[in-house]
Amino acid sequence: MSLITTTEALAEVCQRLASHAFVTVDTEFLRETTFWPKLCVVQLASADEAVAVDALASGLDLAPLFELMADPAVVKVFHAARQDLEIVWNLAKIIPAPLFDTQVAAMVCGFGDQVSYGDLVQTVCKVSLDKSSRFTDWSRRPLLPAQVDYAIADVTYLRDIYAILQDKLKETGRLGWLSDEMALLTSPATYEQHPDNAWERFRNRVRKPRDLGVLMEVAGWREAEAQARDVPRSRILKDDVLIELALAAPRSADALGNLRAFPRGMERSRAGAEILAAIERGLARDPKTLPKLERDRRTGGNGATVELLKVLLRQISESHGVAAKMIANVEDLEAIAADDNAKVAALTGWRRELFGVKALELKHGRLALTVERGRVVMLEWQEASQEAEEPAAPETAAG
């Protein structure tokens, strides 16, 4: 067990880690009862050292850690980095970089969609991780030796996984495929949670400009309230209540209280008054200034095309050993079915080369799908036409 509890010890270990080409990083945190995640433990490892940092230790200053996270000479290796990076951003307004996310890399290398750390350790390192501390309350002190050992294991095996994935990416020429994902993960915009943008999580739940205006205001109010009180959004209002408010747009306390999902008694509280004020602001918005609502791509006769694109995506994913989610999602397929020039990742960069071009060819009948020996295969238009035109063998009369 190697547990860091003082600023001096943290500075010393970070200085040693900074001399290495990469460090593996993980965090343990709690967020079940708060809006902002509460950092409890940070795990760090280099090629020859692994430690856990007690982020809740009295008097501990995490500045040396944040300096290491910002060091451009050291690659920071995480698995499923997004929540870890969010915590660092919230605390220090920096994002660890350069960054390597082994979950993303594993998806490019054919290990499946969003493979867990435990499964990756099992597959790559042939080790089954101890899961006895999986549901630990990491805010409780003192930390037991078994808990610290469990936490450190999350960065020790990550070293071997990083090396193996790096080699595989270089061998296949796919190292550059990670650049878009890493750029997204290292963008501050990914972690900024501004109340004005809270409505975007529900953008497909309303269809009328008036409803959108109300949704933008009430979602923004909830976001600001949850942040200010540091409680989960659902503690303020559940998601379905926001949609009900947007669609019904009640304009009085009585009307608010009559909504089926609205919390009883809140309609005549301070929060109720603020919600009614938010609804009025939403109704007063000029429809011309509202974001454009995307029409439902699942309508308009594109359903069959989307289903074919799903088959094509699965075929390409399996044949190239790349997780389907890394190539395209259902929203991308719906967009491509509706518009050849859709602004989706699947029609840009390596994704376009691997999938997008063929998706458009399939959509316009220049590519066909068939089954050979139980597997879906692609046929170019000319090849498919020749097969269709090939005369059937004459039947031989019996007898």
From Swiss-Prot:
InterPro entries: 3'-5'_exonuclease_dom (IPR002562), HRDC-like_sf (IPR010997), HRDC_dom (IPR002121), HRDC_dom_sf (IPR044876), RNase_D (IPR006292), RNase_D-like (IPR051086), RNaseH-like_sf (IPR012337), RNaseH_sf (IPR036397)
Subcellular localization: Cytoplasm
Catalysed reactions, semicolon-separated: Exonucleolytic cleavage that removes extra residues from the 3'-terminus of tRNA to produce 5'-mononucleotides
Gene Ontology, cellular component aspect: cytoplasm
Enzyme class, spelled out: hydrolase
Cofactor(s) annotated in UniProt: a divalent metal cation
Source species, domain of life: Bacteria
Keyword Ion transport annotated: no
GO MF annotations, alphabetized: 3'-5' exonuclease activity; nucleic acid binding; nucleotide binding; ribonuclease D activity
Protein keywords: Cytoplasm, Exonuclease, Hydrolase, Nuclease, tRNA processing
Assigned EC number: 3.1.13.5
One GO biological process term: tRNA 3'-end processing
UniProt domain 3'-5' exonuclease: residue ranges: 4-170
Residue intervals of the HRDC domain: 208-289
Record family assignment: Belongs to the RNase D family.
NCBIfam families, alphabetized: rnd
Record function comment: Exonuclease involved in the 3' processing of various precursor tRNAs. Initiates hydrolysis at the 3'-terminus of an RNA molecule and releases 5'-mononucleotides.
Protein name in the entry: Ribonuclease D
Lineage, top ranks: Bacteria, Pseudomonadati, Pseudomonadota, Alphaproteobacteria, Hyphomicrobiales
